[in-house]
Amino acid sequence: MADGHSFNNISLSGRGGKNPGLLKINSGGIQWKKQGGGKAVEVDRSDIVSVSWTKVTKSNQLGVKTKDGLYYKFVGFRDQDVPSLSSFFQSSYGKTPDEKQLSVSGRNWGEVDLHGNTLTFLVGSKQAFEVSLADVSQTQLQGKNDVTLEFHVDDTAGANEKDSLMEISFHIPNSNTQFVGDENRPPSQVFNDTIVAMADVSPGVEDAVVTFESIAILTPRGRYNVELHLSFLRLQGQANDFKIQYSSVVRLFLLPKSNQPHTFVVISLDPPIRKGQTMYPHIVMQFETDTVVESELSISDELMNTKFKDKLERSYKGLIHEVFTTVLRWLSGAKITKPGKFRSSQDGFAVKSSLKAEDGVLYPLEKGFFFLPKPPTLILHDEIDYVEFERHAAGGANMHYFDLLIRLKTDHEHLFRNIQRNEYHNLYTFISSKGLKIMNLGGAGTADGVAAVLGDNDDDDAVDPHLTRIRNQAADESDEEDEDFVMGEDDDGGSPTDDSGGDDSDASEGGVGEIKEKSIKKEPKKEASSSKGLPPKRKTVAADEGSSKRKKPKKKKDPNAPKRAMSGFMFFSQMERDNIKKEHPGIAFGEVGKVLGDKWRQMSADDKEPYEAKAQVDKQRYKDEISDYKNPQPMNVDSGNDSDSN
């Protein structure tokens, strides 16, 4: 690059471990972005005070200090990168990188260098280690000569590491010449006071700037008292207590709920907090929109006139979610994202949908999509490969809904289901305006193509891109597309078919996959005819006329006939149906099958194995019983005739 350099695998080093990402260095400054999204660092050229090189294990480390006292460490440079970048810093920034050497002697005595908000321990003028004073939570004098620095033990630091630094103790003898004291104030006291002044902490526990009591938090679920401190926030609940440094706060989201008196406030974290084995990258809070609060900030006059001048006010009175986000924004330095230009059919900021088995709302934002409240899922536009509108295959009430599939560049997919039909135009227009690729209508994802399918008439077929694709491609007689059409017409209540082998594991909604299989095998010609655009009603009548003679004997089943074999999915459904009803009180009967289908698809082959084993046993049972049934003894024949005569 003529105007800069780009590196694909550079890690940002800190208390949270090493996070690999993309680093760009140009004449305007330094930008680093974590791989897979999340934390980002931007340092303007005018804010850079100094740069330095340090030789570390297997690579080189670039240190960047800013006017605000922040110190960034980027690790992963090759030896051949050092000369070219050093020349670039000299020519573009006017900064000559210093070369820091590490001490490997193993000695634990030396000198302390305090610069900005960084403490560096030197052994023989070489660096042994360094820590950021911004991570210091408090200091304590131990005896006459020892000073202990305690670090923030928050729930995000070291989320990807097994160990995290908690405290360091320094021994400062009375003979120390760097921190000169007197009889009433020994060198250890001088050192302690110096750290307190530079780290902006008190010798005791830091008081909260402001506290919001009994806030409803949906993820992780519970009611918490939210304390905003100068360098961290704390969530105090009855069962859990989380401490989060502001350096882990990536962004704030302020998202009102449509037609409801609540507002979401989301705090995005990197690294996330951890509760047991569960990671929470987003804290989802729910405020009552009309609640008014009056808060007084507990901040010294010195800080109000320096660090927070023209940012924070001494007191606030207003809506609780606005006061909360305003104070948190300036304390943490994170930006706030609010709804953009998108409006739903009800003039709201989001559309109702479901993700996996959870109902929620999807917010189309200016730079991404955000599904709330559970599981909170943020998808940036830069991460999206394409989107696709999908019509429900089933008929009836489901025909008034559609799905939105978002496929990421990492090949991961998010399927947002059960979006109301009247939101189709709004979503398509918004997504098109963002330049996102739309894989729809057989690849013809144009505005005219979608408009032809999404006409304003009330015909249910108008919203079905798959049905239109079938009609346009009738000559090809695509079995895959015809499956969807036959599925919408044939409704035998999801009963099992005669074939109940291993293919049933693909069923997603209470045996729907089995219905597909039966339709494909027995009526291929009728499927092709349906693709020519015949009305569903006429198709059904024609099918009834042509098969009336065959169907009459089947109206009454032989009670002595053996019970059909069940698939692995059906065994799974029997076991889990009651659990689903307990987890989702009041769930509709039709939704139970959808939830079961989603859970079945997410299960691994090992998890399915017990149910598939039962299916194989049941299949053999049915095979044996049907053999005896079809080859009965004379007595059994008489019994069968008696049954038919009843």
From Swiss-Prot:
Gene3D superfamilies: 2.30.29.150, High mobility group box domain, Pleckstrin-homology domain (PH domain)/Phosphotyrosine-binding domain (PTB), Structure-specific recognition protein (SSRP1)
Keywords: Chromosome, Developmental protein, DNA damage, DNA repair, DNA replication, DNA-binding, Karyogamy, Nucleus, Transcription, Transcription regulation
Annotated Gene Ontology cellular component terms: euchromatin; FACT complex; nucleus
Subcellular location: Nucleus; Chromosome
Entry similarity comment: Belongs to the SSRP1 family.
Function text: Component of the FACT complex, a general chromatin factor that acts to reorganize nucleosomes. The FACT complex is involved in multiple processes that require DNA as a template such as mRNA elongation, DNA replication and DNA repair. During transcription elongation the FACT complex acts as a histone chaperone that both destabilizes and restores nucleosomal structure.
DNA-binding region: 561-630
Polar residues bias: start-end ranges: 633-646
GO MF, one example: DNA binding
Annotated gene: SSRP1
Biased composition (Acidic residues): 476-493
Region feature Disordered, mapped onto this chain: 471-569, 601-646
Observed effect of gene inactivation: Failure of fusion of the polar nuclei during megagametogenesis.
Quaternary structure and interacting proteins, as annotated: Component of the FACT complex, a stable heterodimer of SPT16 and SSRP1.
Distribution of this protein across tissues and organs: Widely expressed. Present in embryos, shoots and roots, whereas it is not present in terminally differentiated cells such as mature trichoblasts or cells of the root cap (at protein level).
Bias type Basic and acidic residues, positions: 514-529, 601-628
One of the GO BP terms on file: karyogamy
Name assigned to this protein: FACT complex subunit SSRP1
